[in-house]
């Protein structure tokens, strides 16, 4: 599913004022790159990225105003092409008449922002990159546990939703159940959220669908969370050798990002919520430089070398 972003979306989500070119507010923005047409103001348009959103700051505007009226009209007409999604003018600067005329003629929206140029670029870039980020969906449950985004996966019926319910009761926050939408917003960052249709909902076999926010309050849910850890729940297999020390760390690749993964076997009597809670705390401990498994291994090796073990 490819996101469609239009100039109208910028008006809806940011403190922008439409100055002219209203006919083009439904133009599609196809890239997260933003162009500052500095060299174009001199008349050099050979490599003009006309498909990008254009941003005019104080420097570009000062140069533009130093041009003659005829030159300003020429630059404005060449800036406003049939595929340019819009021109944003920062710092609340007045829009020259030549630019307004070219905007109305070509249908390129001119948007005015009261913010500084750097702030405008930063916010627009972050917004567009999140919209155009690579996207996938995974069957599982995403929970925020002590600030760690834990993605719980496993075959259907293994107890993912029931475990998430117990985690919510223990004070943690549900992000998504059953279907987790994941976007790669950076080279090493995965952000998960719930589809709007099932946001805040949990499906519990025997009970049906429950609204977590209604039952437990607004503090029991959040709209999105960065995924840091994967917990794979699987039915206990007597023939399989499970990790008992934690020295070897499995990884799971989601799009271009590798995430640490722990496999937790399921059988009666095991408190999965507590185990996953501890896994999240242990993950935080590792990020702070404390690895209990490695410390135990080093302690054991030292005792063996000293001959303290018989």
Curated annotation (Swiss-Prot):
- Enzyme's top EC category: transferase
Q: Where is this region: Important for the catalytic mechanism of dephosphorylation?
A: 265-270
This entry's Gene Ontology molecular function terms read: ATP binding; magnesium ion binding; phosphorelay sensor kinase activity; protein serine/threonine kinase activity; protein serine/threonine/tyrosine kinase activity
Alphabetized UniProt keyword annotations: ATP-binding, Carbohydrate metabolism, Kinase, Magnesium, Metal-binding, Multifunctional enzyme, Nucleotide-binding, Serine/threonine-protein kinase, Transferase
> E.C. number, please?
2.7.11.-, 2.7.4.-
Q: Where is this region: Important for the catalytic mechanism of both phosphorylation and dephosphorylation?
A: 202-211
The reply on keyword Transmembrane is: no
Q: Where does Mg(2+) bind?
A: 161, 203
Catalytic reaction(s) noted: [HPr protein]-L-serine + ATP = [HPr protein]-O-phospho-L-serine + ADP + H(+); [HPr protein]-O-phospho-L-serine + phosphate + H(+) = [HPr protein]-L-serine + diphosphate
Q: Which residues bind ATP?
A: 154-161
About its domains, the entry says: The Walker A ATP-binding motif also binds Pi and PPi.
Q: Tell me what this protein is called.
A: HPr kinase/phosphorylase 1
Q: What is the lineage of its organism?
A: Bacteria, Bacillati, Bacillota, Bacilli, Bacillales
**By which gene is this protein encoded?**
hprK1
């Amino acid at each position: 599913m490819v996101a469609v972003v239009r100039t109208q979306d910028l008006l809806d989500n940011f403190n922008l004022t439409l100055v002219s070119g209203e006919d083009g507010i439904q133009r599609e923005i196809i890239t997260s790159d933003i162009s500052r047409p500095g060299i174009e103001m001199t008349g050099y348009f050979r490599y003009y990225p006309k498909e990008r959103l254009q941003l005019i700051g104080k420097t570009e505007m000062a140069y533009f105003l130093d041009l003659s009226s005829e030159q300003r009209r020429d630059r404005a007409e060449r800036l406003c092409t049939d595929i340019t999604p819009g021109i944003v003018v920062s710092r609340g600067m007045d829009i020259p008449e030549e630019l307004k005329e070219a905007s109305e003629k070509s249908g390129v929206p001119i948007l005015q922002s009261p913010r500084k140029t750097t702030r405008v670029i930063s916010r627009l870039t972050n917004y567009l990159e999140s919209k155009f980020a690579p996207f996938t969906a995974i069957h599982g449950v995403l929970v925020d546990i002590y600030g760690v985004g834990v993605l719980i996966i496993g075959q259907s019926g293994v107890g993912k939703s029931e475990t998430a319910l117990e985690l919510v009761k223990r004070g943690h926050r549900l992000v998504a159940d059953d279907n987790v939408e994941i976007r790669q917003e950076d080279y090493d960052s995965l952000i998960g959220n719930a589809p709007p249709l099932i946001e805040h909902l949990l499906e519990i076999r025997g009970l049906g669908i429950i609204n977590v926010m209604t039952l437990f309050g607004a503090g029991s849910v959040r709209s999105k969370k960065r995924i840091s850890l994967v917990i794979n729940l699987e039915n206990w297999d007597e023939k399989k050798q499970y990790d008992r020390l934690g020295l070897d760390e499995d990884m799971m690749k989601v799009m271009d990002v590798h995430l640490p993964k722990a496999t937790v076997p399921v059988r009666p009597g095991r408190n999965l919520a507590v185990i996953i809670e501890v896994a999240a705390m242990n993950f935080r401990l590792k990020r702070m430089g404390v690895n209990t498994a490695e410390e135990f291994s080093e302690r054991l090796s030292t005792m063996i070398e000293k001959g303290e073990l018989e």
